Amino acid sequence: MAIPFNPISITIGKDGLSSFKSLRIDQSTGAHHHFDLTVDLESGGNRQVHNISSSKEWLGKDIIVKAANKPFFCGIVTNIELHRDGSDFGCIQVSGYSTTYRMETAPSCYSWNDRSIGDVVKSLCSDGKVQLALNAAHKKQLDYICQYEESDFDFVRRLALQYQEWMYYDGLKLVFGKPRRLPDPIKMEFGTSLSSLNIGLQTLARPEQVFTFHSGANREMDRKTPDKAYGHDRMAGDAFRAALPSYPKAARQYSIQRVSSINDLENYVLLKQAAETAETHYVTAESQDPRLHVGSVISLYSSFLKGVGNLSQESLGDFIIIEMTHEVSESCYYKNRFKAIPGTVMSLPNPKVEMPLAETQMATVLSNADPHGAGRVQVRMNWQTDNMRTSWVRVMTPDGGGSKDVKSNRGFVFIPEVGDQVLLGFRHGDPARPYVMGSLFNGTTGNGGGSNNSIKSLKTRSGISVILNDDNKSLEIKDAGGSSIHLDGNGNILLNAPKNIQLHAGNDMSLMVGHDLQVNVGNSQTTNIGNMLLTNVMQKILVNTPFMQQLVADFFHTQAGKALLNSQNQIKIEAPETNVVGEQRLFIHSAEKAIFNSQGIIEMRGEQGTNEFNQAFSYQKAVEEKAKRCVVYFKRSENYNGEYGFDWFIWVRTCRKETINLSTP
């Protein structure tokens, strides 16, 4: 039953209402408070009106409700109606919300870097001119926080859900985070200050297993809910434990909070289960005390008469109010109804807010200088302005990872360049967990694949390229200095270097040429061999040079079936001792003069005689042979052990195989 409580006053804007017909205020945690006010036409301007032209000035104005000249509710007027029924003049119905409604902006996108959630909430409340009592438990700075297609108020509610923060409007200000000190308890007793009281228990506890992945540490993490009644009073603990056997299977869920350590995950699942089971033990009651509001703490007592002069009283504990309805009638009769949960709870019930589902976004790369050298990039999405940007995000690749032999960068490593346009995806649809799906050409950067889409290419920012041409079936690799490898698709390869080419082989190197080999050197050629040079030529070796010098430190041996030493000018053979041997015949010829000269003694010996003639034999000079090229094709014999021997082939019309032993002089 309501009782008169005369000192109730209402002000809209600068207008104080002299009277009103009724007032109702609905309050709950994690949501706007809503009010409905009914006033007569005199209070709204003029009773003899056909419209609401006078009272329309109240739209958008603040409304303040006072009890005993002390404000207990502040709101904003959002709706006015002229209501008529029957033959009376009617009334004005005024409705609206708590001042938090100023944060009910149109769905918006915004982002912050290196800020705590408390910093973000403080900034948004300042923008909405909403008083704030801030004491967020999560104080770490986050590298990236993103509001995505949400009003400012829904975004704050979502932060409270993700980070398990207390959030409620107490009638005058928004409370974010559990207050450092809860309000002093107000004693409420059934039978005196409470006209009705209901006490309830419900089975809300369910086992869960929460998983997440930390890419920086390459670590999969998961934790089960503790399934213990932390923060619950005795009755709630009994109901908590009674509920668990009904759900033997733990639900698997991803962590909606970005966590970086196993301790963070353990704390998250602890508070998550505490919030989901906060209303396990609850009370609902009615009172006439206008001091109560959402967030008030009450010391609840139950009492009744056991007999004349015998009052039985029992403390039910301290409770915190989470839902409340205030009602004031025309004669200032006041009453309220509320729902409360034990004051020992670790978390309030979760705000009823949906997690946003981020869609693919186009973005521009701002930096690829990952401070950790992990190949990540920072990008700016189209809606991000000023200094807004993502944190360092990973880049999708067709193949990437590590292996036993390759610890990092195994696979395709193609990091977008600054200024590139990329497409972003989002893990679990979370706008704070973007990754690069790939790059996009646009009207100024794309050139297509040529006619018939025949060109496939890979090009770096400096001009290094790999070009595959399906028209002529060719492949070309170029660097920025002009060096190239060209495979023309017809079996030919062209290797070109404007400067130098070096070939290094740690062990062996084989060069196989099926037909001709031509080597052109513009200046000089040097060949250094550590042990032995072995050259096997099937037909001829021809050397053409203006000057030739051979330096042999120890032994020089030339062996041939026939040998010709020919000079157009002069041949000199000089040695401390020189032997010229013809096993059957030795013939020394000069077309003009032959001189045998010795500064010592000349000896001529013939075992069968010595003859002298004054008539010379005729001598036909060998015809000089000239050629321009030589082709060599050889390989080692199968039983080669270092001696002079080969398996060799002549590919003309037939093939013959023969082993030649050159070890005998």
Question: Language model features by range: what are they?
Answer:
Residues 70-76, 305-320, 429-439:
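Short, Lys/Arg- and Gly-enriched loop/turn segments at beta-strand edges
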Residues 57-59, 291-292, 416:
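Short, well-ordered loop/turn sites that connect or cap secondary structure elements
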